Amino acid sequence: ESPPDRVNYGALYQKRYPVLRKAALRLLSQPNASFDAFCNENGWWLDDYALFMALKDAENGRPSWEWEAPIRRREEGALAAALENYAQQIAVWKVYQYLFFRQWDALKAYVNGLGIQIIGDLPIYVSRDSVDVWATPSLFQLDENGNPVDVAGCPPDGFSATGQLWGNPLYDWDHMAQDGYSWWMGRIEYLCKVYDVLRIDHFRAFDEYYAIPFGSADASPGRWRTGPGKNFFRILKEKLGELPIIAEDLGFVTDSVRELLRDSGCPGMKVLQFAFDSRDSGGPNYIPHNYPTHCVAYIGTHDNDTAAGWMTSAAPGDVEEAVRYLNLTPEEGYHWGLMRGLWSSVAELTVVQAQDLLGLGSESRMNTPSTMETNWQWRSLPGAFDDQLAQKLYRSMVRYGRIKE
């Protein structure tokens, strides 16, 4: 039994799908015009996705590269047989998506009606075991056997001596360019409908991406390669116009990345914790008095410790510098003082995590990179956000011009 402030994904996986399957079969037992319309409108991605997931079920979850060669290679006869043999399970997976988006659209309409916008995340890469790689292998750097030639990651730095080996397949940008990056255009256009604002993860890979030979033990043998650059964003603007996009431009940032960010017109990100991190030579870029107006400022992202947690887990010298710079005091609350540092800056948008508003410690951090145990499990409890906190937040927003009184 998990504590109430933690999501137990294992239990949900075991208990939720049998119930969902019953609901899906019940929906499929009678005509449903709304479901049919959803399938027709979203068939461009839904058909391959549902087939892929039905095949995963039939293969007991085995990764797609371990399937039999005919279906792994999407041979015509094997695809036809799968569509016939797994027709019901394919339809069930389509119902799951229909139910999700029906609920999501209702939630989004509700919060938009309150004047709230939703920022969604667009991961730069997809998993090797994904419908994208299986259905459109020509878009990725794969060999004749369907294995990645190189995979994604980050080079060694002050935070990791061997770098980060993510393992995702890399895009074949030259091939993608031949049809005007249509796969990417469709992805971005669709997600801009799902969310109000889109944050593109690992923006620097559009300028240069790090390629690590497949099978490497760590990221150290990797090399930087040229990405699609300005041409990608020129085509994006031509096809889709001005879009509400935030660029995650953290990490190893070069002059060419900064130039691409300026040309794209997207605001970049500033992380307050990085301003005081003695391991990071880029600290001055993250100190509030150096912020440009056109940026989005955070105390920390989902990959960082909470504000209160950082005060106890960071190097003592880093914490002392933050205390001096922001005049932090226990009376105000260290976490509240860090938020004040953001709100009083010129950044046009600031983001604080729910955990920081509540003053929670490291036990409530959302994600610890390179670990898999307790990530993305924290959730707030009923009553955590009370009227007293709302009034305090409101006064701060008025004081720093974040809202009008």
Where is each model-derived feature located?
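Conserved, well-ordered alpha-helix/loop/beta-strand core segments that scaffold catalytic motifs
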Residues: W93-V126
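Terminal-tail/helix-coil boundary detector
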Residues: P382-E405
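Alpha-amylase-like alpha-glycosidases and glucanotransferases acting on alpha-linked glucans and related
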Residues: E1-F101, V126-V351, Q355-D356, G361-S362, ...
